[in-house]
A protein has these predicted regions:
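Membrane-targeting and insertion segments and their boundary/processing signals
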Residues: 7, 45-48, 74, 78, ...
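Short, structured motif recognition centered on aromatic/hydrophobic residues
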Residues: 18-23, 33-37, 68-81, 103-108, ...
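Intrinsic disorder/low-complexity detector
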Residues: 11, 73-100, 168
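A cross-kingdom feature marking solvent-exposed beta-strand/loop segments within repeated
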Residues: 13-20, 29-66, 91, 127-150
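Short, Lys/Arg-rich amphipathic alpha-helical interaction segments
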Residues: 146-168
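Short, Lys/Arg-enriched N-terminal segments with co-localized hydrophobic residues
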Residues: 1-12
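Surface-exposed interaction/gating patches
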Residues: 22-27, 98-129, 133, 141-144
Length: 168
């Protein structure tokens, strides 16, 4: 039985929260974030003023909603930064839509997390999940066992990953 608050029905954590959380987790400078965003496609870039708007809280003056394309470039840049670029393969197209499942998948790839690592990350955040729950998150959207990753699940994953990375 799946607790109703563990999986969402369409709700997605705002991109700005994800960007801020990963930036804090890895202690990235503004310049490094900008560099990661342009890493998958040097023709795509943002400037410091845009990043400042993305990093503000929703209720702060100057807040700018981080679009899916920006977060997708950032996550792909993070994967390339952590894993390197495979010159034998053509570049992967950047995701057009980013939801919590995509964020989870990109972070899993970037940090080379196996199932056991994923379970540890969730447990370290005080939010253990079962094997069937986890496998449902990584299924294709049309699959009968696919589940959307809810905000609570993603927040706890980011919290656990931050504890692991920062050693806090």
């Amino acid at each position: 039985c799946v607790a109703p608050d563990r999986f969402s029905h369409g709700e997605t954590m705002i991109n700005n929260d994800v960007l801020r959380s990963i930036r804090y987790m890895l202690d990235l400078s503004d310049n490094k974030v900008i560099e990661l965003i342009s890493l998958p496609d040097p023709a795509y870039s943002i400037d410091k003023a845009q990043l400042d708007g993305f990093l503000k809280k929703e209720d702060e003056e100057g807040f700018v909603q981080c679009r899916d394309v920006v977060l997708a470039h950032f996550l792909d840049g993070l994967v390339l930064h952590c894993r390197g670029r495979n010159e034998n393969l053509p570049p992967r197209p950047v995701e057009k839509r980013v939801n919590n499942n995509v964020v989870l998948k990109k972070l899993r790839v970037a940090f080379e997390l196996k199932d056991v690592d994923m379970h540890q990350v969730f447990s370290e955040a005080g939010f253990p999940i079962s094997k069937p729950e986890m496998s449902a998150l990584f299924r294709q959207p049309g699959h009968k066992n696919f589940r959307l990753c809810g905000d609570q699940l993603l927040r706890n994953f980011l919290k656990g990953l931050t504890l692991r990375v920062r050693g806090a």
